[in-house]
């Protein structure tokens, strides 16, 4: 999907590696001249053409993929015909044309029984083009050079020039009246994702990045492949506030098997210790006793660094290492159910708590071993699992992109223009607002992992 957001304009030349990976299909222009289009773009163009035909609007292709050499020839032709000032205004310099992407189309329109691609004639068909523009997002297209955006795009309004970007980005751009340039710089927000079992948090981030076609995507607390539930994903400028969201308390429901301990402290690992389960202590009482603050030993399979090396690297190399301990607080913990050698707990913990380690410690307090069999993050801060969307729902456009301010729920301080300028320039300010700044050193992205 990211390739569909490739920006090519007067300031951004087409990259050679993009051209190497371009998959084109053969087709024909309105005058039967052979041409090519990127394969997904062509498929969606055909669907658009079919939809418009049902509305008695007949479109065809006037211009599609162009090589750099093609664009050079066009530049020279129009320069000779109309002069240098004209081509500077209306014709792209070679390597800066959208047509190099294979994603751009200049439409021809059937008027009075014949196709026309003459710009002056097309400009007289504004009413028809308005109908075309309205349904473009349904097929992943945008009007690339809209009215009133000339200073941003660098080109005059072209009703006939459309560009494939993918359905979700196209819908967002249409609703916000954004150009591609504006989408790339302005699109940001926070998604509440319901992560499924089997995927890593990185898998989710990568898929979200592909869906929206943007590079800046992060998350606020790793969930292991075994785990599911609330994963908060930040996009664009929202990536900068990820650490603030990570600091919020998290709520989990965990399944536990007694009598077994694995190297990973969950059921996916190799069994390293086992013993018959013979619990003489009261299970609920022991579980409740963990509502406290204590020094928790982190799992060896984690991204915590010791001497500049991640713990899981020591584990994979089978090298001994002293496991660090960190202070964590179990704010709430409750036994939900139990059956012989298994039980389920619900707990609310502070940042940095490993549920796998908590389960190991409960097992030891019971005089046996324990390993995690399932984990669901049901809440992070005020964000509940019922407010999340699955990846499949997001792909279908069924999601809400939350604003940074509504997620952080921080107080608003109004400032005057002078102070606003100082803040934007990064100047030091007197703390006249009595703001308490809490600083915690950055921790690995999966420090809140299960």
PLM feature segments, named:
Residues 1-64, 68-186:
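Extracytoplasmic cell-surface/polysaccharide-interacting catalytic and binding patches
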Residues 73-79, 230-239, 245-248:
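Glycine-rich loop at the start of a catalytic domain that most often binds anionic cofactors/ligands
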Residues 139-140, 291-292, 364-371:
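A common structural junction motif
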Residues 233, 254, 308, 358, ...:
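Residue-level signal for inorganic ion chemistry
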Residues 301-302, 306-331:
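Extended alpha-helical targeting/anchoring segments
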């Amino acid at each position: 999907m990211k390739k569909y957001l490739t920006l090519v304009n007067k300031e951004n030349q087409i990259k050679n590696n993009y051209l190497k990976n371009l998959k084109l299909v053969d087709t024909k222009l309105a005058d039967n001249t052979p041409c090519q289009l990127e394969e997904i773009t062509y498929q969606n163009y055909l669907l658009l053409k079919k939809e418009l035909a049902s509305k008695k609007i007949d479109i065809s292709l006037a211009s599609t993929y162009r090589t750099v050499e093609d664009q050079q020839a066009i530049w020279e032709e129009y320069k000779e015909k109309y002069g240098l000032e004209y081509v500077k205004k209306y014709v792209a310099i070679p390597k800066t044309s959208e047509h190099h992407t294979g994603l751009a189309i200049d439409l021809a329109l059937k008027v009075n029984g014949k196709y026309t691609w003459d710009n002056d004639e097309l400009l007289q068909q504004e009413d028809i083009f308005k109908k075309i523009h309205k349904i473009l997002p349904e097929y992943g297209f945008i009007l690339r050079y809209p009215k009133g955006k000339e200073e941003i795009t660098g080109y005059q309004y072209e009703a006939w020039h459309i560009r494939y970007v993918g359905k979700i980005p196209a819908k967002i751009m249409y609703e916000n009246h954004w150009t591609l340039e504006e989408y790339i710089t302005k699109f940001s927000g926070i998604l509440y994702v319901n992560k499924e079992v089997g995927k890593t948090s990185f898998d989710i981030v990568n898929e979200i990045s592909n869906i929206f076609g943007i590079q800046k995507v992060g998350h606020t607390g790793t969930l292991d492949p075994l785990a599911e539930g609330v994963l908060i994903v930040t996009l664009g400028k929202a990536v900068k506030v990820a650490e603030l969201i990570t600091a919020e308390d998290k709520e989990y429901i965990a399944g536990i098997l007694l009598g077994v301990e694995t190297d990973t402290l969950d059921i996916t690992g190799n069994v390293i210790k086992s013993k018959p389960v013979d619990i003489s202590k009261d299970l609920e009482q022991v579980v409740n006793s963990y509502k406290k603050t204590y020094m928790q030993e982190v799992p060896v399979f984690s991204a915590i660094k010791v001497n500049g090396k991640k713990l899981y690297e020591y584990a994979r190399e089978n090298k001994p290492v002293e496991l660090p301990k960190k202070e964590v607080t179990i704010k709430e913990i409750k036994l939900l159910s139990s059956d012989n050698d298994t039980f389920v707990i619900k707990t609310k913990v502070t940042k940095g708590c490993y549920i796998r380690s908590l389960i190991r410690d409960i097992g030891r307090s019971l005089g046996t071993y324990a390993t995690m069999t399932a984990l669901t993050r049901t809440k992070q801060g005020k964000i509940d699992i019922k407010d999340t969307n699955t990846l499949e729902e997001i792909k279908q456009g069924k999601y809400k992109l939350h604003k940074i301010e509504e997620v952080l729920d921080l107080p608003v301080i109004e400032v005057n223009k002078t102070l606003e300028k100082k803040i934007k320039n990064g100047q030091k300010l007197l703390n006249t607002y009595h703001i308490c700044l809490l600083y915690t050193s950055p921790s690995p992205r999966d420090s809140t992992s299960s």
